[in-house]
Amino acid sequence: MVKKVALLTAGGFAPCLSSAIAELIKRYTEVSPETTLIGYRYGYEGLLKGDSLEFSPAVRAHYDRLFSFGGSPIGNSRVKLTNVKDLVARGLVASGDDPLKVAADQLIADGVDVLHTIGGDDTNTTAADLAAYLAQHDYPLTVVGLPKTIDNDIVPIRQSLGAWTAADEGARFAANVIAEHNAAPRELIIHEIMGRNCGYLAAETSRRYVAWLDAQQWLPEAGLDRRGWDIHALYVPEATIDLDAEAERLRTVMDEVGSVNIFISEGAGVPDIVAQMQATGQEVPTDAFGHVQLDKINPGAWFAKQFAERIGAGKTMVQKSGYFSRSAKSNAQDLELIAATATMAVDAALAGTPGVVGQDEEAGDKLSVIDFKRIAGHKPFDITLDWYTQLLARIGQPAPIAAA
């Protein structure tokens, strides 16, 4: 019998965390009301520190209130249990301690039978490390993860929770920001969208923004011209960017339309930026997982610098939709997937089946409990998809060429 279940949200926010917690509470209350539910605060940091809260009967009775909010009610952090040096530096473990053992011992001390991790590839691969450690040391714990990331880059999962909503919100953000295209003559607007190594979110945001444009009624005779609101360039990490050719093409757009709007993944062009920083002796900032801290190197500003003078921009503006998009409440499309995923996660946990619940691309996208050993990150966006190549053709951008 499962007596106690712990929930944990980790990594960056996505528009699914609060809703996923709500669905897990709902399902456990339906099928195992006697099971105690707790949440570790601030992800793996809370687990290491033994910082948790219990979901009381009052919480379980009003779980539906969580659907109205984004973020995570129990908080997140970026902690990698196998990065001992970072954990010691942050005071989360003592020098000489094994963080996996500290986490495992805390779970046992708290009497936890099941741990649900809600996170992206880093969170779930960290959960896999913990699960492997527990198995080696005969700890009786079942770990069942739920896949969360707005990058939608978890292998082998078709659709991660929150990514659809993030794209919707990014398109909504763009609808307001792009209205600035004629706030000054010859304006260059760069919409920077989250996506470290994967262009999915930038592409899907662009697709949904263009769908919004298609649904509008225009009045060019009064200056309300779709051309000024359109996307003129879309750059993702998976495709090469010919800066010279693009500058020439966008100069023509600027001359004809009077403004230029560029949508980019924050990871687009990063190898060039990093190489440039290293060549000039600058330190490249990284996080606990070894990722380049993109918010500190500002890819959008870099692209603005590359293009502004060459296309004759009178004013340049860089706007980032990332935090706006990732902190939204779940939309209807995501809510349906979250409910199905949480239901299967609870059922798997009660049956003692570990893994990550997701649409398995290697099994016809069937929602399944996927073995932790098969979970990996950095799944690239497929730049050969028909809708994507058609989108680029529509905005006048050459067909994509895969980056090396």
Swiss-Prot record:
Catalyses which reaction(s): beta-D-fructose 6-phosphate + diphosphate = beta-D-fructose 1,6-bisphosphate + phosphate + H(+)
Pathway of action: Carbohydrate degradation; glycolysis; D-glyceraldehyde 3-phosphate and glycerone phosphate from D-glucose: step 3/4
Active site: 151
TM region positions: none
Cell compartment(s), UniProt: Cytoplasm
Site (Important for catalytic activity and substrate specificity): 122
Record: residues binding Mg(2+): 121
Keyword Transcription regulation: no
The EC number(s) this enzyme carries: 2.7.1.90
Cofactor entry: Mg(2+)
Protein's recorded name: Pyrophosphate--fructose 6-phosphate 1-phosphotransferase
